[in-house]
């Protein structure tokens, strides 16, 4: 059981002045009983991640700040427990799983929790093998962590958290990089954990998969609890009711395309790839990919975790060498340096590409003087993405969704012709997703070519004109998006339609 009793927490940065205090949460009363699941949702920056850090003991132990009230785990006050004692009681999956890994191989990572708890070696092997089998991860066993996709890493992180069968689970946006099949699998894992008596606290923006999992929905705003909903009340909310709370859809199968196919895209491709192959070490990841993206067009690149989407993106922008095939831009051969100059990319985990000391400085960091946007244009970009009020903040103090928007802002400010966005809406709330979709539409209208790697049907519906699905390193389908299409069907299609109704 996890209990927060009248908890208020404010982060304190290294600078001890009052102005350095970052927002946290206030007056939180929350109980997650054994065998129950509580969903905490709300806008980016509302305090969801802080709730998870309090529940698993990371705040204030590793995230310093001022704490009042009580946090209890299985009836014991966290203030009187050592960090290892909390870790034995609570299994955690972080927003970015890379920040919780201690091993370089997947099987070792699953076993790590058991080793830390001092289990006998034979029992560790038995439970590790059983967990990998139980969660259907045999194809990911004994793999280098660095060779795994973002979604595959999240699945390994959950396996590590669940290996010891903890009485409590805390998951911070666990589906951020998961494909649709893996999300459905995670739903099954959580239902099983509930049946086994685990108390589960989960924060999410993508809500559709949780409808029959949660026992209570807590909506947060401005660091406090704004509303509590029973599952039946939550399920009864229509799109307007959800939007009023800043929440995303609960019925992904009914999401329809709202962005009509544009007529402003160029008839000739800006980017053309033929027969692309790429390797990681001895393993071939791409097996002869053919792809085109036109100026003025936004293409969604979808597919299962490990299908090769991120590798393809890195090859196209010159960050990873193809082992075979050709890439052309504007009809001419495009070598690595040409692709570097013409493209900008937002990575799956944006924390690896934020370097400046302020949000404002990050937007123009590294740009040559001739290409630095005016102060007015920079302000417009920040305004559009809801970051203007955070211009003076250090990027490290931002929430996951705010960091995502900042990386997108820097990508836009670069003015490059080809923009590649890898999971740009992971960690984004409804408002943030719509803001990014609006900017993508504007960029396409201005003549940019955009390739968006995504599992987000709402985002595809709002701004994409084509859906390309990769499967096992090959293009499985390439389907145009027409207004009012059911996007779920396009993203999961096993073959291309022969006609349009």
Region annotations inferred by a language model:
Residues 41-43, 302-304:
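The feature captures the beta-strand-to-loop junction immediately N-terminal to the Walker
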Residues 56, 317:
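Helix-to-loop junction immediately C-terminal to a conserved catalytic motif
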Residues 122-140, 373-390:
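Conserved ABC ATPase "signature" region
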Residues 144-148, 152, 394-398, 402:
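Conserved ABC ATPase signature
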Residues 158, 408-409:
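Hydrophobic anchor residue at the start of the ABC signature
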Residues 161-162, 412:
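ABC ATPase C-loop
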Residues 169-173, 419-422:
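Catalytic Walker B motif of ABC-type/P-loop ATPase nucleotide-binding domains
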Residues 204-205, 454-455:
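H-loop/switch region of ABC-family ATPase nucleotide-binding domains
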């Amino acid at each position: 059981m996890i209990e927060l009793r009248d908890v208020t927490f404010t982060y304190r940065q290294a600078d001890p002045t009052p102005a350095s205090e970052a927002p946290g949460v206030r007056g939180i009363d929350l109980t997650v009983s054994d065998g129950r699941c509580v969903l905490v949702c709300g806008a980016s920056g509302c305090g969801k991640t802080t709730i998870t850090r309090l529940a698993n003991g990371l705040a204030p132990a590793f995230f310093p700040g001022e704490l009042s009230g009580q946090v209890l785990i299985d009836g014991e006050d966290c203030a009187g427990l050592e960090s290892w004692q909390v870790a034995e009681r609570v299994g955690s999956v972080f927003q970015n799983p890379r920040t919780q890994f201690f091993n370089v191989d997947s099987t070792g990572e699953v076993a790590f929790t058991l080793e830390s708890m001092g289990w006998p070696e034979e029992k560790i092997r038995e439970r590790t093998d059983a967990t990998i089998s139980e969660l259907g991860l045999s194809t990911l066993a004994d793999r280098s962590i660095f060779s795994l996709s973002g979604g595959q890493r999240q699945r390994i992180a959950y396996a590590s958290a669940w290996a010891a069968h903890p009485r409590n689970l805390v998951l911070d946006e666990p589906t951020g990089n998961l494909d649709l099949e893996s999300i459905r699998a995670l739903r099954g894992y959580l239902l099983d954990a509930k049946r086994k008596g685990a108390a589960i606290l989960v924060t999410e923006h993508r809500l559709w998969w949780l409808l029959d999992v949660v026992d209570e929905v807590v909506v947060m705003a401005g660091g406090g609890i704004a509303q509590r909903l029973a599952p039946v009340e939550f399920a009864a909310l229509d799109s307007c009711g959800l939007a009023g709370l800043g929440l995303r859809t609960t019925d992904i199968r009914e999401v329809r395309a709202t962005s009509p196919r544009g007529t402003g895209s160029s008839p000739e491709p800006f980017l053309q790839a033929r027969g692309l192959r790429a390797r990681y070490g001895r393993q071939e990841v791409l097996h002869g990919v053919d792809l085109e993206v036109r100026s003025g067009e936004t293409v969604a690149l979808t597919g299962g975790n490990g299908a090769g989407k991120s590798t393809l993106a890195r090859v196209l922008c010159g960050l990873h060498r193809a082992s075979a095939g050709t890439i052309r831009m504007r009809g001419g051969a495009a070598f690595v340096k040409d692709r570097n100059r013409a493209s900008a990319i937002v990575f799956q985990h944006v924390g690896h590409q934020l370097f400046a000391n302020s949000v404002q400085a990050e937007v123009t960091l590294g740009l040559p003087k001739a290409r630095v946007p005016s102060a007015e244009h920079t302000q417009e970009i920040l305004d559009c993405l809801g970051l203007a009020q955070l211009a003076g903040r250090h990027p490290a103090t931002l929430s996951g969704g705010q960091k995502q928007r900042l990386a997108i802002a820097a990508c836009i400010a670069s003015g490059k012709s080809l923009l590649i966005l890898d999971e740009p809406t992971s960690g984004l709330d409804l408002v943030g997703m719509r803001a990014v979709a609006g900017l993508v539409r504007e960029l396409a209208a201005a003549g940019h070519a955009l390739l968006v790697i995504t599992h987000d049907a709402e985002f595809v519906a709002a701004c994409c004109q084509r859906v390309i699905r990769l499967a096992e390193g090959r293009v499985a389908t390439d389907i145009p998006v027409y207004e009012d299409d059911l996007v779920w069907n396009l993203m999961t299609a096993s073959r291309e339609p022969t006609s349009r109704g």
